[in-house]
UniProtKB/Swiss-Prot annotation:
This is ATP synthase epsilon chain. The lineage of its organism: Bacteria, Bacillati, Actinomycetota, Actinomycetes, Kitasatosporales. Residues 99-124 are annotated as: Disordered. It comes from Streptomyces coelicolor (strain ATCC BAA-471 / A3(2) / M145). SUPFAM superfamilies: Epsilon subunit of F1F0-ATP synthase N-terminal domain. HAMAP family: ATP_synth_epsil_bac.
Length: 124
C-alpha cells in the first residue's frame, strides 16, 4: 500500500470532502504547493484557486476554494476555506454568466471567484 495522508476540506458552512490521498495541490499566498505523505509540517494562507486531490484509489477530486488556511502535520492535511465547492457541484453556465457580469461591472473579486469556479469545473 502506498503512503497516504488524511485530507479534510472544510468550508465555513460544511465539510466538503474528507478521505485518504496521495497528493494535494493548492494555491497559497507563497505560490502553489504540493503536499505528499511525509511532507514537513506547514501552515499557510490559501489563495482563491482550484485544489486538486489525488485520492488513494487513483481518482481525482477538484474543488474551487476561496480564501482560508492550509495546515499539515503527522500526515493530516486540513484545508479550512471561507468558501469551497467540489467541481461537480459547480453550475458552469451560471459561473460563465457571473464571470461576464463581473467583467462588465469591473468587479475584480467577483471575476476572480467566477474564474476559479470555471477552472475547477474544467478539472473535473
Amino acid at each position: 500500500m502506498a503512503a497516504e495522508l488524511h485530507v479534510a476540506l472544510v468550508a465555513a458552512d460544511r465539510e466538503v470532502w474528507s478521505g485518504e490521498a496521495t497528493l494535494v495541490v493548492a494555491r497559497t499566498t507563497s505560490g502553489d504547493i504540493g503536499v505528499m505523505p511525509g511532507h514537513q509540517p506547514l501552515l499557510g494562507v490559501l489563495e482563491s484557486g482550484p485544489v486538486t486531490i489525488r485520492t488513494s484509489d487513483g481518482g481525482t477530486v477538484v474543488a474551487a476554494v476561496h480564501g482560508g488556511f492550509i495546515s499539515f502535520a503527522d500526515n493530516k492535511l486540513s484545508l479550512l476555506a471561507e468558501v469551497a465547492e467540489l467541481s461537480d457541484e459547480i453550475d458552469v453556465h451560471r459561473a460563465e454568466r457571473k464571470l461576464e457580469q463581473a467583467k462588465t461591472e469591473g468587479d475584480a473579486h467577483a471575476e476572480r471567484r467566477a474564474d476559479v469556479r470555471l477552472r475547477a469545473a474544467a478539472g473535473r
